[in-house]
Amino acid sequence: MARKPPPIPKTHERTPGPRGQDTKANNELFLQEVFNTTNKLRGMHGCPALTINAELNKIAQEWANHLRDKNAMEHRPNPKFGENIFLSGGMDVTGDLPVEMWYREINSYDFQKAQFAPTAGHFTQLIWKGSKEMGSGVARKADRTWVVCNYNPPGNVVGQFKDNVPPKK
């Protein structure tokens, strides 16, 4: 029998703006939602809240713009920071959605083994206790939305999962 994913706690409700509107105000609200949802989910695991790093915001925004301009979905080659990426098409996206999608990978993570799992890498980076700061970027084109989050120090370090990816409290 397939396991049903756990419900994701909604951090808030909001009416999404019009699709494809890549305005500064829309992006600031969106990125605040990304940040708030990230810290809410980390808190459920007893992990400290991340702080926003302006340089990581810039790096994440540049990569989100690059992905939009290439119409691609790929990780930055040889990143210095942890990175989660998200692409959605055909629907309005709020800032909590990408974070909640990454969090759903909890279903693929084995807390007993406490090691990297390719199907849970976004979740483990999101929760990684040793990460202290983050930066996010969002880019839109037509009905597509790209989201990039960078984390410092990076997570998913071999041999450190047991100490950095705690189960829910």
What do these predicted regions represent?
Residues 7, 26-27, 52-55, 110, ...:
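Poly-acidic low-complexity segments
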Residues 78-81, 89-169:
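Disulfide-stabilized extracellular recognition modules
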Residues 10, 19, 73, 120-123:
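Intrinsically disordered, low-complexity regions enriched for glutamine and histidine
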Residues 16, 30-34, 72, 106, ...:
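Membrane-targeting and insertion segments and their boundary/processing signals
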Residues 20-82:
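Short, well-ordered surface patches within globular domains
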Residues 1-19, 169:
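Low-complexity, intrinsically disordered flanking regions
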